[in-house]
């Protein structure tokens, strides 16, 4: 169970962008950084554990060619082996800062030469993989930047061509020294997922076709892709093969954010945030899904949600036209939550899961289980 905590005020409301919240925890200093996009600026806040704001900074998108001010599309902290960089994307280019936003160390201007007169030019989708930072583009390409241990000598090392429509999000997980491991996934507006192996030269391993709706947010968990779609579904795929494990009708409207820490958080425009436990069956290795918590944010078009700590004991939410960051924290330890809540599980070979907030009819026979509808495949 989670309870509402003290909110963190914003100078301006959050823009209606998917994944419009980034969180960086600094355990040594007992601080948490939050980043939110508002039009042509990004707001950076530092807060104590009780939610008291301690410092604020506002970053502007770097001006480029054009008459209108550039709009920011995303802000995200990238944790690299030897440093942390803050990456800001806009309709003009890609800006990289030191983690506190005090010094810009790199600027990459977007080349609109390949864009048609009616096509918007922007960068969107940011993730770190080893000493690389990957950034998605409106053209479907993914730029890979090689980041040095210190200093501004950042190099564009590669451009990945796997998508034909704008990139929406990128997710990574540590390869941990394994060869031929799928450790990067990119998503686009058509719902297509591209799975890559990182390295000096990135390699495309597989493509997972879309089905007519965008995929605004993706995550990677132990070689499994969690993908959130515009129809409210969360789908779990085997990263190396593209095999579908589980399909969850998690929300009634488009999903806007996913996060892992280590449970899966899903947030959508239906005002709900859900938390799911993912595990593998010890008997057959099947993916199992267990609903842990659902939180309604009334009268709010949720646009961003993130866990605030690695254990997943707290999370934060942003909403369109909402001038504050909402905070929620667990009132029970993880062990107490497991003992005190009824739960249900499903093996991917057998079932499709429907959340109680996803009000859709199903032509398949159903049965009720702890207020959730489980449809048999």
Language-model features, listed with the residues they occupy:
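Short C-terminal beta-strands that terminate individual repeats in beta-propeller domains
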Residues: 9-13, 55-66, 106-116, 156-162, ...
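Short coil/turn segments that connect the beta-strands within blades of beta-propeller domains
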Residues: 30-32, 82-84, 130-131, 181-182, ...
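Beta-propeller domains
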Residues: 1-2, 29-63, 100-101
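Conserved strand-to-loop turn within each blade of WD40 beta-propeller repeats
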Residues: 37-38, 88-91, 136-139, 187-190, ...
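Short loop/turn segments immediately following beta-strands, especially the blade-tip
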Residues: 47-52, 99-105, 146-152, 197-200, ...
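Terminal intrinsically disordered, low-complexity extensions flanking WD-repeat/beta-propeller proteins
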Residues: 2-20, 29-31, 272, 278-358, ...
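WD40-repeat beta-propellers
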Residues: 43-47, 94-98, 142-146, 193-197, ...
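Canonical WD40 repeat/beta-propeller blade segments in eukaryotic WD-repeat proteins
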Residues: 15-26, 65-78, 113-127, 164-176, ...
């Amino acid at each position: 169970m989670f309870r509402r905590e003290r909110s963190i005020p914003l100078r301006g409301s959050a823009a209606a962008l998917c994944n419009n919240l980034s969180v960086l925890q600094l355990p040594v200093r007992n601080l948490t950084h939050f980043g939110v996009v508002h039009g042509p600026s990004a707001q950076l806040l530092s807060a104590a554990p009780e939610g008291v704001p301690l410092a604020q900074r506002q970053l502007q998108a770097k001006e480029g060619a054009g008459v209108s001010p550039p709009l920011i599309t995303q802000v995200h902290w990238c944790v690299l082996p030897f440093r942390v960089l803050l990456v800001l994307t806009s309709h003009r280019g890609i800006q990289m800062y030191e983690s506190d936003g005090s010094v810009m160390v790199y600027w990459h201007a977007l080349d609109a030469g390949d864009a048609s007169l009616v096509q918007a030019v922007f960068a969107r989708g940011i993730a770190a993989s080893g000493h690389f930072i990957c950034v998605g583009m409106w053209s479907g390409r993914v730029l890979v930047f090689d980041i040095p241990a210190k200093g501004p000598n950042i190099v564009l090392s590669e451009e990945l061509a796997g998508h034909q429509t704008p990139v929406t999000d990128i997710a990574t997980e540590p390869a941990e020294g394994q060869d031929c491991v799928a450790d990067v996934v990119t998503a686009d507006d058509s719902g297509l997922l591209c799975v890559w192996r990182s390295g000096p030269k990135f390699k495309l391993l597989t493509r997972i076709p879309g089905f007519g709706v965008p995929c605004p947010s993706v995550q990677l968990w132990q070689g499994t892709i969690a993908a959130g779609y515009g129809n409210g579904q969360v789908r779990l795929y085997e990263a190396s093969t593209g095999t579908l494990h589980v399909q969850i009708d998690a929300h009634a409207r488009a999903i806007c954010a996913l996060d892992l820490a280590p449970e899966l958080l899903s947030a959508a425009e239906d005002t709900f945030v859900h938390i799911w436990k993912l595990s593998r069956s010890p008997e057959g290795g099947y993916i199992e899904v267990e609903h842990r918590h659902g939180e309604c944010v009334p009268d709010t078009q949720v646009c961003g949600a993130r866990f605030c700590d690695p254990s997943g004991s707290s999370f934060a939410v942003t909403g369109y036209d909402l001038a504050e960051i909402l905070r929620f924290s667990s009132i029970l330890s993880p062990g107490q939550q497991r003992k005190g809540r009824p739960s249900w599980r499903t093996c991917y070979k057998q079932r499709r899961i429907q959340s109680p907030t996803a009000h859709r009819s199903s032509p398949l026979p159903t049965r009720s289980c702890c207020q959730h509808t489980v449809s048999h495949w």
